């Protein structure tokens, strides 16, 4: 897949505001500071299209990016920071559950994990959450440029052992671009199936 155009489409805080045009979606999920914005920007070929919040865990909306005018890349709120009120956490959970339960257009969720921390409890909880809703998801390990080959291989084995029900697992570096072509190729098959 070649991305020729990508633009911000809309932010959503309520399920009734989700796009109604029926275009297929790939959603990106991950804990705060995992490199989700960097990965999405690298895939879309834009430096600052998907923006990271200045305060980790602050973003509480679902952001839609129209890609090639044919499908959406969806930036889900980062999880894992408790520096927000309980009511805001509950609203986020309701929004996420509603989106994951009912979204027919959602073809795949890409769960990002930091390759330096291959099996954090919070990421394993998200694995359970996605499995519970019966959604197809893949694991993309970020920040792979920060580990040497030996540590990277060990980390990948740990991830493969800890996570379950995933479609595939692959490594990605926004710094070097490693994995970009392969990930876009795989995502293309889900968008057209």
Swiss-Prot record:
All residue ranges annotated as the EngB-type G domain in the record: 22-193
GO molecular function: GTP binding; metal ion binding
SUPFAM superfamilies in the record: P-loop containing nucleoside triphosphate hydrolases (SSF52540)
Cofactor: Mg(2+)
Gene3D superfamilies, per database record: P-loop containing nucleotide triphosphate hydrolases
Superkingdom of source: Bacteria
Function: Necessary for normal cell division and for the maintenance of normal septation.
Residues binding Mg(2+), per UniProt: 37, 59
Pfam families attached to this UniProt entry: MMR_HSR1
PROSITE patterns reported in the protein's UniProt record: G_ENGB (PS51706)
Protein name per the record: Probable GTP-binding protein EngB
GO BP field: division septum assembly
Species the sequence originates in: Chloroherpeton thalassium (strain ATCC 35110 / GB-78)
CDD domains: YihA_EngB
Family note: Belongs to the TRAFAC class TrmE-Era-EngA-EngB-Septin-like GTPase superfamily. EngB GTPase family.
InterPro entries: G_ENGB_dom, GTP-bd, GTP-bd_ribosome_bio_YsxC, P-loop_NTPase
Statement: the UniProt record of this protein carries the keyword GTP-binding: yes
Residues making up the signal peptide according to the UniProt record: none
Keyword annotations from UniProtKB, A to Z: Cell cycle, Cell division, GTP-binding, Magnesium, Metal-binding, Nucleotide-binding, Septation
Binding positions for GTP per the UniProt entry: 30-37, 57-61, 75-78, 142-145, 172-174
GO terms for cellular component: cytosol
